[in-house]
Amino acid sequence: KEQRTKSKDISPTTDQTNQNSLDSWFLAPGSSILVPVTMLEEEVYKAEICTYLARKTGAHLILLRANDYGSKAKRNTQRIITHIQTIAERTGETITYEERIAKGDSFHIHKELHLIASSPDSPIALTLLTASREYGLDDWLFGPPEQYVICHSHVPVMLVNPRADLFSLCD
């Protein structure tokens, strides 16, 4: 004879759902997510992730645009803002964000990130980095900028690799 077991309803209760939500892991209410934006095209792909995190946790987004001479970083920041506004309109949710201009350019913005996040009055709870690009010889010898941020940051760092054809040296 076959033995059949009764299946139990294993759907989470309301208390379990609240305990497992993203905000109870690392983002407290009123915290911020630091999103650096450089001239690389891959930066735009962070828009989906930072928008999702802001919607689910109620965190404030700080878009830190690199102070470049060209218009690529500015264009990437504008594309991220457009994505945030589109999602906010579609869902009817409020997503708060602000745009700041960094002191450094796209090649030196990483050195500024840990200074911003580690200040005593900083509400930043997470830094969102893109770690997918073509690495040069200096990255192989001295380490990539993402590794510098991870080693010196006082807040969690989330690395995003949007391209399957490239890899991250920080994995």
Regions found by a protein language model. Give the residues of each.
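Active-site phosphate/pyrophosphate- and oxyanion-stabilizing loops and adjacent acidic/basic residues
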Residues: 51, 111-115, 147
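Short loop/edge segments at beta-strand edges and connector loops
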Residues: 99-103, 161
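Amphipathic coiled-coil/heptad-repeat helices and related helical stalk/stem segments
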Residues: 18, 46, 109-110, 142
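Gly/Ser-rich helix-loop-strand patches that form or flank binding pockets
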Residues: 1-26, 117-171
